[in-house]
Amino acid sequence: MIWTLVLAPILIGLLMYALPRSADVAAKWFGVAVAAGAFGLTLLSANAPDESIRWLQRPFTANFHAGLGGLSFWLVALLTLSTACALASTRIPRQRDFVAQMLLLMGAMTGLFVARDLFVFALFWDLMLIPVFLILIAWTPSKSDASAWRYLIYNLTGGLALLLATAAYGVIEGSTDVLGATLGHGVAAVGPAWGEWIFAGFAIAFLIKTPVWPFHTWMPQTYADLPPAAAAVVSAVQSKGGLYGFIFVTAPLLPDQMHAAAPLMYVLGLVGLIYGALVALVQDDAKKVVAYSSLSHLGLILLAAFSGNQVALGGAAVYIIAHGLFSAGIFIVLGQVESREETRMISRLGGLGARNPRLAGSLTIVALAALGLPGLCGFAGEILILTGLYQSGAVWVAGIALVPIVLAAAYMLRLFQGIMQGPDAADLPERADASPLELLAVAPLVVAIVLLGVDPRPVSDARSVAAPAPVSAVSER
């Protein structure tokens, strides 16, 4: 059942190219149905046993081993839900091709999060780059493909580093089928001579993917050039691949190297936190406000990942899902604004709230979650991370991290006020308010934002990431 979540979207995405180009509307809603069905299947697979198919025996053992325990379950649920919501809201030329690429992306990212073999993890890591690159090439609003190639070169560099580190680990240990072990148990430790090099390969890949300052320069223009539906999914889920890798791969496999790298990662995380918040404050492009705010938010999760504190790790799990929910919601609403007003520049917008109260209501909830309002999901993750950092003895880190968290209120309120409040923009025609279908596209994310804010325990308890599960059809190593 778990491999069905991976293979079905990929196969359906490829088969969609057999549909006539005139079937754009049907393709859109078929894509929504596939993503919604995958979300339902994910919920039904919460306690499914691991699945493993024997594969390589030389130069090391590698198996198609998949599991859906711990944080993997919540990330796949976030992925399928955000994809369904994003596709339901999309308005784009050549929707058949776009939906096909989005389903390919969903399948590849699902493969990444369910992989319990490190080599399979690395393969899906590179596979998920292809749909995003093709979307950037085909639908970028600019005349240049620079952002597409920058995205590909940066992330392929990280993917190559990950693949080399994975191959080295496999040759040294004899197997890459190691990610299914319970966190901290049953995993062979790599010697210090090779451990630092392998950790460096993993870290380069994960820092680029997240991204973390100063490896972030591919991200702002990529988010700006992606169609809103694609930006919603990439920001919500693909950016979590690096953080998931630190928690799920390096923490159990290379604990000594994780501990040794913590001071450096604290510095990178704090710089990203502050830099992202300050740059978000002065952006005129609404999508770049969200991009730089993501750089800040993800820096906070990086601090938690290297704290070694269970409360902070629980907060990291919550904030990974929380950021996915509100960032997807913001990009979807900004897409609805841009489709009406034909601009996303804050300086050219204003007064939309009075004319579009339903649209304003949607933006209000997701923006309040992003700035950390108590009772919504963002606050739950932040408070757990800060508490855990304090408990771990990193008091100075927690203290500095408070500053950009406060700045989040400033840039999110500026975003909301610039778009929804103030005098009407004189050169913008009056448009209809959000339709019931557009509200329905955001509603599941809003419900999840509230539920996670009220009770974050189901997600925070998933900090073990690789929950132990029986394996069906386990191959002999």
Where are these regions (language model features)?
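Transmembrane helix-loop-helix hairpins at membrane boundaries of multipass inner-membrane proteins
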Residues: 1, 12-100, 175-184
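N-terminal signal-anchor/start-transfer transmembrane helix
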Residues: 4-24, 204, 211, 433
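Alpha-helical transmembrane segments
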Residues: 10, 31-40, 80-81, 103-107, ...
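Alpha-helical transmembrane segments and their helix-start/interface "positive-inside/aromatic belt" motifs
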Residues: 24-35, 146-156, 356-360, 436-441
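Hydrophobic alpha-helical membrane-insertion segments
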Residues: 32-46, 155-166, 366-369, 445-454
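Hydrophobic transmembrane alpha-helices and their helix-loop junctions in integral membrane proteins
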Residues: 85-91, 96, 107-119, 131-418
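Cytoplasmic/organellar membrane-interface segments at the starts of transmembrane helices
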Residues: 175, 182, 226, 356-358, ...
